[in-house]
């Protein structure tokens, strides 16, 4: 039976190896030290000392364990305790595209995930009056953020979750529904699909491969279904793609919560604005 001299509460060598590899650092050389450091770092000045001591004991005995971000950053000089951030696409302008890119990079550098609803961006091909050109549409912008997620990792080691959504009525929804249908997307003259190449090399670049995607369904969609009993072609295609590929997912936002279209990839938090974070 496994028994550790330095961390007697660990029941296997895997547990101790994981602790040593991911969470052990100066000032937190053992599990007990990490528990004390974490509670002092996060709770000092917020709860009475007796409660802090009780919390430390619960953690040492593994009756309560905080999220991995808290374990990793406890006592470090630059702590980033928040797991995910909600970012808002305000308007389809060069300034907003640039601002969203900056926000996304800033969050991803901390190892935090991001969630964005792109429904306010104009459909691809829309005329841009100021320049006479045409709009790229939301999907290329999703691709840009996806690329940021591919190359920007916190500490050079931790990838972050990315979430992107689009309203079911958006003019680009047909393209969005199949953007990750990789088996039906050929790559150049190779005769192979993105799906084929992904199976050969998991890290092969494919459309939105760093991003979880979902379709937003609002009150109008729900009321239409109640009146007609028909879910509509977008929903049926959504179901087909979800069954075939696992995505897009379904984001339901009805009535007083209709505008709460922002969420992180795991959906612990949903919101209308971008001031909310996930800190689980």
Regions found by a protein language model. Give the residues of each.
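Extended catalytic cores of very large enzyme megasubunits
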Residues: 1-280
